[in-house]
Amino acid sequence: MSEAPKKRWYVVQAFSGFEGRVAQSLREHIKMHGMEELFGEVLVPTEEVVEMRAGQRRKSERKFFPGYVLVQMIMNDESWHLVRSVPRVMGFIGGTSDRPAPITDKEADAILNRLEKASEAPRPKTMFEAGEVVRVNDGPFADFNGTVEEVDYEKSRLKVSVSIFGRATPVELEFGQVEKLD
């Protein structure tokens, strides 16, 4: 007796900006065609990010892989055609056009772990690095430029070295109080 084929993760390319609709349409097509046994999860990996706008903390979602949808499925002709028939699907990534290759279990685990971590706490939308020059846009040091010395993502705070009267002075600021200089 042969073992049932295992569901593997495949990457489907969708029109950018339509990933959510493609995932929803795919779920509906699977149900409509009664092919639930061939499919597992359909994911658009996102993380919640926080940004400061006009002094307000705003949460939004950012896609890990814009333009891509992850589909857990058993690949055969029927499942391949079902995915390809969904509107705004451009095709599979990896392998050949008629025989797509799944991502490795290691890659799938890394993505799923990243999703799990992303659901625990929102990340800042803007990432800062030590040595980067920023402009302070709020508080007593508004309109001063400074160099990032330390970044604390847990507390969403920065230590910025601001030049005041010719002396470098370390200042603790929140992410929303500074902006990157281009």
Swiss-Prot record:
Gene Ontology annotations for the cellular component aspect, listed alphabetically: cytosol
Domain of life, per lineage: Bacteria
Occurrences of domain KOW (ranges): 131-161
Keyword Transcription: yes
GO biological process assignments: DNA-templated transcription termination; regulation of DNA-templated transcription elongation; transcription antitermination; transcription elongation-coupled chromatin remodeling
Annotated keywords: Transcription, Transcription antitermination, Transcription regulation, Transcription termination
Family: Belongs to the NusG family.
Role this protein plays: Participates in transcription elongation, termination and antitermination.
Name of the protein this chain belongs to: Transcription termination/antitermination protein NusG
Organism annotation: Vibrio cholerae serotype O1 (strain ATCC 39315 / El Tor Inaba N16961)
Gene: nusG
